[in-house]
Amino acid sequence: MGSYIPSTGEERQAMLQAIGLTSTDQLFDVVPESVRVKSLDLPEGLSELEVGQKMAELAAKNRVFPSVFRGAGAYRHYIPSIVKTVTSKEEFLTAYTPYQAEISQGVLQSIFEYQTQMCELTGMDVSNASVYDGAVAAAEAVFMCQERKRSAVVVSGAADPQTIAVIKTYCESREVPVIVVPADGCATDPAAIQAALDGATAAVYVQSPNYYGVLEDMDAIVAATHAAGAKVIMGVNPISLGLLKTPGEYGVDIAVGEGQPLGMPLSFGGPYLGFMTCKKAMMRKLPGRIVGETKDDDGNRCFVMTLQAREQHIRREKASSNICSNEALCAMTASVYLAAMGPKGLRQAAESSAAHAHYLAGELAKLGFGLCSGDKPFFHEFLTDSPKIGRASCRERV
């Protein structure tokens, strides 16, 4: 019997005889007759040609929109063909990461390279091997900032509503106070953030570009937060970092975001990638896996899972988080994308996205659709008001 060829009828009969049975049905005698499925009443199978025709018939009922402009956290960018070619190789596309991870040096090296690239991209010191998505990354970052006398988190109301909802869900079980500061128009007011800070505040979460596409005043927000003794978590679009200042340049403590724009298709919502990078001082609070570089007994360069005392297979329920191995493939997808694009390619993608968005905003303005954000700077998406609806109503509906 070949690796992927099912057993023949003769082979199945021989196996039944070996255990003293005459039919496959006898294997299920222990299942009560009343709950057994008598028949599925399925039609005859179709040929390959007939299946293709049936699928074409169903697809013809769809309304296809080649251009997707929805944005709001998931973006359709150009993906070099080499990304799928590399990530589809059987050496990487496996069912599971071995428990003895060090035998998979290729996988560990790909994770290490991903971590290195994310640190360079965000300007931070340390990266983990990723988490499930950007919202989870934000919620995990909140827990990283928890201290004995500081637990509350202040969240910008201009952040992605789904991210805010996930943060609230995570914090509810631990009774962590979540204070949402309403957006001032389409942006965050640094003075409002400052007013919400007190001695119990552990962290402030701000997204820039925010949900409305506006670039926040991160310098003022970081200064106010650090002056109050709290930490800053910045949610960021990774494509924007090809053009804009990095979280590290702003002086934030933790940078998180949705990694889907880095080579992952929309795929009806997943699987996506949550990236997390932080300052070295917070490294031991970083959730998920971290791969480090070392040398073996012969002095050869090799890679290992490091700082494992934080993880679930050692600390169990006290672990900082629980992350599955599927994320390694998504992380490698981002790594291959960044390698294929290079610094110039990433900057070109960012500049092209920003230029097209600003061109569209200008053309819509000629038709009477103004920007809800007024003259505030934005990156590659924006919210318009409608001449018939009004600016406030547009924001409310979004």
Model-derived regions: residue spans:
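Compact, charge-rich alpha-helical regulatory domains located at protein termini
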Residues: 1-39
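Hydrophobic alpha-helical scaffolding
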Residues: 2-5, 17, 41-45, 101-104, ...
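Conserved PLP-enzyme active-site core in the AAT-like
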Residues: 15, 136-304, 368-369, 391
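N-terminal entrance/gating region of PLP-dependent enzymes' catalytic architecture
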Residues: 33, 37-113, 314
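Gly-rich Lys/Arg/Thr-decorated short loops/hinges at beta-loop-alpha junctions or inter-strand turns
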Residues: 89-101, 117-123, 149-150, 171-179, ...
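Short loop-beta-helix segment that forms the pyridoxal 5′-phosphate
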Residues: 99-103, 119-139
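Active-site C-terminal subdomain of aminotransferase-like
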Residues: 262-367, 371-375, 379
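Conserved PLP-binding catalytic core of the aspartate aminotransferase-like
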Residues: 369-395
